[in-house]
């Protein structure tokens, strides 16, 4: 029997509640499909500050590095807003990404038929949307040097540097090509090559890699047009590949096609070692401990972990089908509630998901 070590990071706010739901479901599908998940919980974020004084204890990072996958719930609490920026809960996540050398962020966006009315776009525009945004996570303008603010000639100037090396583009492009090959063999690389030298390099490297993935249809799109096309005709996209800045913006735009951030999972991957899987939503401290949280993004993040991190696609399919079935039956948490549906709390939603398995 295959065995996998999974580090659970419940974190802050609603994190412990949604982690409990995901863990129950993971145990069921693991038993059904003949593998074993060995869970280890570790503190991160505000809970780690309370326990150790640090947002990312060394013991947490060590445990994550030796795991097969890491499943994170949520980080953040206004209780710590008065701390120096480097001591706040959110720096725990940044440190974890750095410590695991994660460079590829994956954001799937799929329209669930039962929730199609939740989108702000017309049904005929978003029906059938199923795309993946692949964002480079560690380079580009957020990390480029030099950067800063200076005063010269009586004027203040701020500056940042947008830079990518060929090797940085190659490794993220490889991830995107492989994902496209596992999906529908369509890859759209998004850049600003009509203006930026760094984007011209990006486009050249993507084109250079394309012959190695001959079955994948490659196209290019300027980022301003891509932002428009995501709203005008999102069905045209399968896999979107882009850099850190453009991906930061486009992934949030794509997320809102669904109408609820409470349904969106994500993954961050490196070249080696475990991936990090987490919901897109935050810690929602205003509803923490009240049994109001929506656990579905956490469950779908667990499904991504099974599919991508542990190569257990059949078990992942079970979790995704359970989510679809529960929603089709009219069960909703408060963030998804609409007329004629049945309201449920976090625990009760978990019970319905278990029944749907």
Curated annotation (Swiss-Prot):
Domain of life: Bacteria
InterPro entries the UniProt entry points to: IsoCit/isopropylmalate_DH_CS, IsoPropMal-DH-like_dom, Isopropylmalate_DH
Cofactor: how and how many bound: Binds 1 Mg(2+) or Mn(2+) ion per subunit.
Pathway annotation from the record: Amino-acid biosynthesis; L-leucine biosynthesis; L-leucine from 3-methyl-2-oxobutanoate: step 3/4
UniProt keyword Aminoacyl-tRNA synthetase, yes or no: no
Keyword annotations of the record: Amino-acid biosynthesis, Branched-chain amino acid biosynthesis, Cytoplasm, Leucine biosynthesis, Magnesium, Manganese, Metal-binding, NAD, Oxidoreductase
Family: Belongs to the isocitrate and isopropylmalate dehydrogenases family. LeuB type 1 subfamily.
Entry function: Catalyzes the oxidation of 3-carboxy-2-hydroxy-4-methylpentanoate (3-isopropylmalate) to 3-carboxy-4-methyl-2-oxopentanoate. The product decarboxylates to 4-methyl-2 oxopentanoate.
Name by which UniProt lists this protein: 3-isopropylmalate dehydrogenase
Organism: Synechococcus sp. (strain CC9902)
């Amino acid at each position: 029997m295959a065995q996998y070590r999974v580090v659970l990071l419940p974190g802050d706010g609603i994190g412990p509640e949604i982690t409990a739901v995901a863990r129950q479901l993971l145990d069921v599908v693991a038993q059904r499909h003949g593998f074993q998940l060995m869970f280890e919980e570790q503190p991160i974020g505000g809970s780690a500050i309370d326990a150790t004084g640090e947002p990312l204890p060394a013991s947490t990072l060590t445990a994550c590095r030796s795991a097969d996958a890491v499943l994170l719930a949520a980080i953040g609490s206004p209780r710590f807003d008065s701390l120096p920026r480097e001591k706040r809960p959110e720096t725990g996540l940044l440190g974890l990404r750095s410590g695991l050398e994660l460079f590829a962020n994956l954001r799937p966006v799929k329209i669930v038929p039962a929730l199609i009315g939740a989108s702000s776009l017309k049904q005929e525009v978003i029906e059938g949307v199923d795309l993946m945004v692949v964002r480079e996570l560690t380079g580009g303008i957020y990390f480029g040097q030099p950067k800063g603010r200076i005063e010269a000639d009586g004027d203040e100037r701020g500056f940042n540097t947008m830079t990518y090396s060929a090797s940085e583009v190659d490794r993220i492009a490889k991830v995107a090509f492989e994902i496209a090959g596992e999906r529908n063999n369509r890859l759209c690389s998004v850049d600003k090559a009509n203006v930026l030298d760094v984007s011209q390099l990006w486009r050249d490297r993507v084109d250079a890699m394309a012959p190695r993935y001959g079955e994948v249809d490659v196209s290019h799109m300027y980022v301003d047009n891509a932002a428009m096309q995501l709203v005008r005709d999102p069905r045209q996209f399968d896999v979107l590949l882009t850099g850190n800045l453009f991906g930061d913006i486009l992934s949030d735009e794509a997320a809102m096609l669904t109408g609820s951030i409470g349904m969106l999972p994500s993954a961050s991957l490196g070249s080696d070692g475990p991936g990090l899987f987490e919901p897109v939503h935050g810690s929602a401290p205003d509803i923490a401990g009240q049994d109001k949280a929506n656990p579905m993004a956490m469950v779908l993040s667990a499904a991504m972990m099974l599919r991508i991190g542990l190569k257990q696609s059949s078990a992942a399919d079970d979790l995704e089908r359970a989510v679809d079935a529960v929603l089709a039956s009219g069960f909703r948490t408060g963030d998804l509630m609409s007329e004629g549906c049945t309201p449920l709390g976090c625990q009760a939603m978990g019970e319905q998901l278990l029944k749907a398995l």
